[in-house]
């Protein structure tokens, strides 16, 4: 059955790119509502659907959605990953400005808040998007692809010249709470040279060594080092789950990303929905629903994960 959060939960922090204070609150919603964002600092046209066709194309450093009036919310990928990875199908996300707070750079604060509140089952079945045929998009060396599968798998490969990251590959079945155990604590990352360029262009003004993994060659500059030896590829998988959640329903698919980013994953969803024969909507029976992301999440997964960091 569809779910929502039992009661509101609030998060306070700063926007990664703006550096401005930001507050976000996740509210319960009724069945069939889906996920919507609402700007509380805007008087009219404040609602934005968390959907693939609301994403502004070509934005590289984050996922930014906009409504027909031009009202925007940026950096939604981590909170979307947390909602998807915890199995929340319906919620209203209120934010008091144009950017979701970055918090610690991962999705674990959002996950902790959602799991602490718990979920409420709603009187409506879950519908999923079943992939029937491969869909692939490319940009240079980057590839994003969806293949048929009876559950959501994410395969990801990255390559960076900085040896602190290097080449990393990981595959994960997203069922049975694996997002919480394996991915949600992995932080956004960047190279020091990229930080310098972003700062020169007025970006990443809220970024610090406490909310991002910054590397310079073989050196990890962030205090405490890495949470996982392959934290970078895990974070790319986290981002991918958040961006795929903008499909509007859980995906039964195998997603493969090779050096892919936010813009390419959105391009993949646009390609998918432009090919109606490549997918179908299915009403999930109990067996199918048990294979979706977020099913089986336990509160004990979070402290067990945190102790491993």
Q: Where in this protein do the model-derived segments appear?
A:
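C-terminal regulatory domains involved in ligand/effector binding and gene-expression control
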Residues: 1-90, 94-309
